[in-house]
Regions:
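Structural signal for short hydrophobic segments within the conserved structured cores
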Residues: 30-32, 62
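Conserved short-loop catalytic and cofactor-binding motifs
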Residues: 10, 32, 45, 67
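Non-catalytic, surface beta->alpha helical segment in thiol-disulfide oxidoreductase systems
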Residues: 59-85
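Loop/helix-junction capping segments adjacent to catalytic residues or to phosphate/diphosphate-binding pockets
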Residues: 15, 38, 73
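Local sequence-structure signature of Cys/Sec-based thiol-disulfide redox active-site neighborhoods
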Residues: 1-30
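Short, glycine/charged-enriched secondary-structure capping and boundary segments
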Residues: 20-22, 45, 71-73
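Structural micro-motif
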Residues: 49-58, 68
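Thioredoxin-like thiol-disulfide oxidoreductase module
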Residues: 34-52, 78-85
Length: 85
């Protein structure tokens, strides 16, 4: 399974949903909280092509996007393959 990194904020319901889906899939992930951390937010945005909303999810070298993007991948049947790569 490729490394998974998810940038989050503690009060973000979409972050919790994305983490729940990854847990349901049995995927271990590194969570990076950007709560009040401008340097972490800037690093996330730079890595995510300027997107500054959370969550931002990376599977291996691929930027998946946010929570809706993760669920769209799952709904299309492509998330399991990405997690197994």
């Amino acid at each position: 399974m490729p490394p998974i990194v998810i940038y989050t904020k503690s009060s973000c319901p979409y972050c919790h949903s994305a983490k729940d889906l990854l847990r349901q899939k049995g995927a271990a992930f590194e969570e990076i909280s950007v709560d009040g951390d401008r340097a972490a937010q800037a690093a996330m945005a730079a890595k995510a092509g300027g997107r500054s909303t959370v969550p931002q999810i990376f599977i291996g070298a691929e930027h998946v996007g946010g929570c809706d993007d993760l669920y769209d991948l799952d709904g299309a049947g492509r998330l399991d393959a990405l997690l197994a790569a």
